[in-house]
Design a protein with these regions (language model features):
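Short, well-ordered alpha-helical
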Residues: 1-57, 62, 84-87, 229, ...
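Short Gly/aromatic-enriched secondary-structure transition segments
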Residues: 14, 48-52, 425-442
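Short helix-loop capping/hinge segments that flank enzyme active sites or metal/cofactor-binding pockets
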Residues: 29-49, 209, 261-310, 314, ...
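Short glycine/serine-rich loop segments
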Residues: 61-62, 66-187, 356-379
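Glycine-rich, small-residue loops and helix-cap segments
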Residues: 70, 121, 181, 187, ...
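A short helix-breaking turn/cap at a secondary-structure junction
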Residues: 149-230, 392-407
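Acyltransferase
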Residues: 224-246, 271-276, 299-320
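Long, hydrophobic N-terminal alpha-helical segment
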Residues: 407-435
């Protein structure tokens, strides 16, 4: 590709050649050079977060940086960003605005602007960024590179200047999926000293082609983006089965990010630094200062609305494996951003802001180029823990060799009550790496009883020879759970419920929730409803 030659303002600080030579380039990533977004600590250099008043060198490197170093990669320096990682444009920095490597008239995207640029120009092989609202994907799209935004908590954020700490993710930029994935593999790992670090089992990758969700309504893209998007849908049809779905709840969720709890969280993180100093970007000050006046009532209203939208989105993943979306609706010029800095930025987050709120993982990859020569980026999204599936899908999209992912043994578990999709304990299943297989029914001999307790649940018992033996059986969902996670899951099941053999209507047998005899109370028999959802609907 032809890259612009104008000054990119991509670097804030660099290590000297002597400093770089001091690292032992031994390990799986030996020979790779990497850059670090300047809100992530690299020992010996200041972490400015885009604020030149922050001049103290970091005494140690962030966990993510150190993991790359330990794997043999060599750090080169720190990259420019929208100040305090607040922005998707790449222009809100006293160190200068970054441009797309394809056009010095168009913005680079942010907030991880410099990281995407130095990968695109070939100055480094890999760069670290962060992604709260899309900062690891928008710059990837605007510079024609790959951007991995992992499941929240898979990569430690210890040593990262917080923007919105409960949502922040460390991300990876590279020119191809395989290199990005190699860095990702080195970065992932539980950190007991990071309160937001999580242990999440990797969901198994199906051998069949993926079912790819595509929005069933127009997305209000600019005309050149629209052409590239239609070409992207055609390419998706070559990868797997395309299914058109309603994404309105996802897009509504995106609008929540700069409201309520999450704007207040930004104010909590660095609002005290946004004084009248000329070093502070005025747009960043204007946006974040609004969080100062939000109340606890505003916060809980936001949490409640997010919970409602999360429930609305959950059934989507029963229909598809991954969701395909554009990364942005347009690619603005510097002049457009200057004329409307907040409105333009808001538009850029339309398809990315919801990702961390809904606990999704994502990967941005180059799509068909626009007719004017600018890049067009698409993203694949999936529920938490499905990072391997996204890597495999992204590699196929880019025409690369298959990404090597660990194939996990798994077991199918039938659930009938509180672990059903949308029910209170479903998150426990998903958090252990389970993926929905489908809905079916038990053999007709099963009866369903109401089990009391703080959380009412159904208990299934097989009673051969009863009147129910000619019925349709009880509705259950089948979930595929990594075998390694089965023991921990079974340990959460308290009497009178247990995990045991469960016969299905088709004659097959799986593990499932059953109840012991002391729960079989004829007065609490709710078999006639045919399933837990129908019972709840009758209440």
């Amino acid at each position: 590709m032809d890259l612009v030659s104008a000054e990119q303002h991509a670097w804030i600080s660099r290590l000297t050649a002597a400093q770089q030579a001091g690292y032992d380039a031994v390990g799986d990533l030996a020979g790779l050079r990497f850059a670090v977004k300047d809100n992530i600590d690299l020992a010996g250099l200041p972490t400015t977060a885009g604020d030149p008043r922050n001049t103290t060198p970091a005494p140690t490197s962030a966990v993510a940086v150190q993991r790359l170093i330990d794997a043999g990669a060599v750090p080169v320096g720190k990259t420019n960003l929208d100040q305090y990682a607040t922005g998707l444009v790449g222009t809100r920095s006293p160190y200068g605005a970054c441009s797309s490597v394809f056009s010095d008239h168009h913005v680079s995207g942010g907030s991880s602007s410099g990281s995407a640029v130095v990968v695109a120009t070939g100055e480094v092989d890999v760069a670290l960024g962060t992604d709260t609202a899309g900062s690891g994907r928008v710059p990837a799209a605007f510079n024609g590179v790959v951007g991995i935004k992992p499941t929240r908590g898979l990569i430690s954020t210890r040593g990262v200047v917080p923007a919105c700490r409960s949502l922040d993710c460390v991300t990876v930029f590279a020119r191809d999926v395989s290199t990005a994935r190699a860095a990702y593999d080195a970065l992932v790992g539980y950190d007991p000293s990071d309160p937001y670090s999580r242990r999440i089992a990797a969901a198994p990758v199906p051998a069949r082609p993926p079912v790819i969700g595509v929005p069933d309504a127009p997305l209000d893209l600019d005309p050149l983006h629209e052409q590239a998007w239609l070409a992207s849908i055609a390419r998706a049809e070559e990868l797997g089965q395309v299914r058109y779905i309603d994404v309105s709840a996802l897009l509504e969720t995106a609008a929540l990010l700069y409201a309520g709890p999450w704007l207040a969280e930004r104010w909590l993180a660095f609002g005290h630094l946004l004084d009248d100093s000329p070093a502070v970007d005025p747009t960043v000050r204007r946006i974040v200062t609004a969080g100062r006046d939000l109340t606890a009532a505003d916060a809980f209203a936001g949490f409640t609305r997010l919970a409602e939208l999360t429930r609305a989105v959950e059934p989507t993943w029963n229909e598809i494996d991954v969701l395909l979306l554009p990364v942005t609706p347009t690619h603005p010029t510097h002049e457009q951003v200057a004329a409307d800095p907040v409105g333009t930025n808001t538009a850029l987050g339309r398809f990315t802001n919801m990702t961390n709120l809904l606990d999704l993982c994502a990967v941005a990859v180059p799509g068909p180029q626009r007719s004017d020569g600018l890049p067009f980026g698409v993203q694949f999204l999936a529920p938490a823990g499905h990072d391997d599936l996204l890597a495999v899908t992204a590699a196929r999209w880019c025409g690369e060799e298959p990404v090597k992912v660990e194939v996990q043994d798994s077991v199918v578990v039938a659930v009938a009550g509180a672990h059903l999709s949308g029910q209170p304990l479903n998150a426990d299943l998903v958090g252990r790496g389970a993926s929905l297989v489908g809905t079916t029914r038990t053999a007709p001999e099963y009866r369903m009883f109401l089990v009391g307790g703080p959380l009412p649940r159904p208990g299934l018992t097989r009673l051969p020879g009863t009147a129910a033996s000619t019925g349709p059986g009880i509705e259950v969902e089948l979930w595929r759970l990594p075998t390694a996670a089965l023991g921990g899951f079974v340990g959460t099941v308290a009497p009178p419920l247990a995990i045991g053999p469960l016969d299905l209507a088709d004659g097959s047998r799986v593990l499932g929730f059953v109840c012991t005899g002391d729960a079989v109370d004829p007065d609490r028999d709710i078999t006639g409803y045919g399933g837990w959802r129908a019972y709840l609907a009758s209440r």
